[in-house]
Amino acid sequence: MEEGMNILHDFGIQSTRYLQVNYQDSQDWFILVSVIADLRNAFYVLFPIWFHLKETVGINLLWVAVVGDWFNLVFKWILFGQRPYWWVLDTDYYSNSSVPIIKQFPVTCETGPGSPSGHAMGAAGVYYVMVTSTLAIFRGKKKPTYGFRCLNVILWLGFWAVQLNVCLSRIYLAAHFPHQVVAGVLSGIAVAETFSHIRGIYNASLRKYCLITIFLFGFALGFYLLLKGLGVDLLWTLEKAKRWCERPEWVHLDTTPFASLFKNLGTLLGLGLALNSSMYRKSCKGELSKLLPFRFACIVASLVLLHLFDSLKPPSQVELIFYILSFCKSATVPFASVSLIPYCLARILGQTHKKSL
């Protein structure tokens, strides 16, 4: 088993080496792709856009992103996936030969296990939702036309082009092995396809959001404690990252498994609070919400405010405080975009309309 994994990992190292040597000019492109594919952009950019254009798509997108990343966390704890940037330096596989030289980058040194790839899984799930939702909107209940078939081909070609670039990016940056990004893409699509058949997420009560948030946290914590009780160190990757990363400042606490867990749970609970708030009912369910200019105003205001909000980084000196603040910050993102911003704009535009009469 170990010998087979070593061969698989060696193939990944050779793939990374090949990309880094032959595509040096594409370094900035691969870094950009990796940054764009980060799940943070699904929360801060894609969600507010889709929610105010088509509410159900935005809700579905957020659920897929959150639950998909939760499954990614559990899979990583089970699979104990290595990462290229530390494996190539830590293994004795190359004891009888020279160790391949692998470059590291500021976005390389993630601290969680490597399998499956979170970037590949998140991008696959989120973009699958956007493609299938767009096709459903344009098709409606009519018989597919020639134009729709062309759109279908273009969107799916675009989808797979994105996945290919994300996968190559993660391999180039020595953050993942090839088999890990493939597993991520397949897992992300599976989660998105599953949620396309779940209708209860669109009218879930606040109680249901709270119960699901508690369940996801309780299961993850219980699973962590169970494995720890069995003598399994689930934070083994943090030591690897700190030991083998070229620069200490490249090791970021916000890439640890628990940081991801708290951010996702905060996002889900924030969505539940927003959708069940009186501010949401007064703004997004009123006559004003049907107007396209109002929706675009909500999108622009959300993107600007969330961009400023994203620049606020919780202090990471104390892990517990960092996790709590990350949870609160993440909960604020959907609450502001879904409830607070539309409510404020509705009040302002409503008063302006009254004065003009």
Swiss-Prot record:
Q: Which GO terms describe its biological process?
A: cellular response to insulin stimulus; cholesterol homeostasis; gluconeogenesis; glucose 6-phosphate metabolic process; glucose homeostasis; glucose-6-phosphate transport; glycogen catabolic process; glycogen metabolic process
Q: Name one Pfam family in it.
A: PAP2
Prevents secretion from ER, short sequence motif: residues: 354-357
Which residues hold substrate?
83, 170
Tissues expressing this chain? Liver and kidney.
Query: Taxonomically, which superkingdom?
Result: Eukaryota
Q: Which residues carry a glycan?
A: 96
Please tell me one Gene Ontology term that the record gives under cellular component: endoplasmic reticulum
Q: Which residues lie on this side of the membrane: Lumenal?
A: 1-28, 82-117, 169-179, 233-254, 313-320
Question: Which residues act catalytically here?
Answer: 119 (proton donor), 176 (nucleophile)
- Entries under SUPFAM superfamilies matching the protein: Acid phosphatase/Vanadium-dependent haloperoxidase (SSF48317)
- Asked if Transmembrane is a keyword of the record, the answer is yes
Phenotype reported upon loss of the gene: Deficient mice display hypoglycaemia, growth retardation, hepatomegaly, kidney enlargement, hyperlipidaemia, and hyperuricaemia.
Topological domains, Cytoplasmic = 50-60, 139-147, 203-211, 276-291, 342-357
Q: Membrane topology type, per the record?
A: Multi-pass membrane protein
Q: Where in the cell is it found?
A: Endoplasmic reticulum membrane
UniProt cross-references to InterPro entries, sorted A to Z: Glucose-6-phosphatase, P_Acid_Pase_2/haloperoxi_sf, P_Acid_Pase_2/haloperoxidase
In short, the EC number is 3.1.3.9
Which key words tag this protein in UniProt?
A: Endoplasmic reticulum, Gluconeogenesis, Glycoprotein, Hydrolase, Membrane, Transmembrane, Transmembrane helix
Q: Tell me where it mainly resides.
A: endoplasmic reticulum
Please state the pathway this protein functions in, per its UniProt record: Carbohydrate biosynthesis; gluconeogenesis
Query: What PANTHER family does the annotation carry?
Result: GLUCOSE-6-PHOSPHATASE, GLUCOSE-6-PHOSPHATASE CATALYTIC SUBUNIT 1
Q: Which family does it belong to?
A: Belongs to the glucose-6-phosphatase family.
Q: What does this protein do?
A: Hydrolyzes glucose-6-phosphate to glucose in the endoplasmic reticulum. Forms with the glucose-6-phosphate transporter (SLC37A4/G6PT) the complex responsible for glucose production in the terminal step of glycogenolysis and gluconeogenesis. Hence, it is the key enzyme in homeostatic regulation of blood glucose levels.
Question: Which protein are we looking at?
Answer: Glucose-6-phosphatase catalytic subunit 1
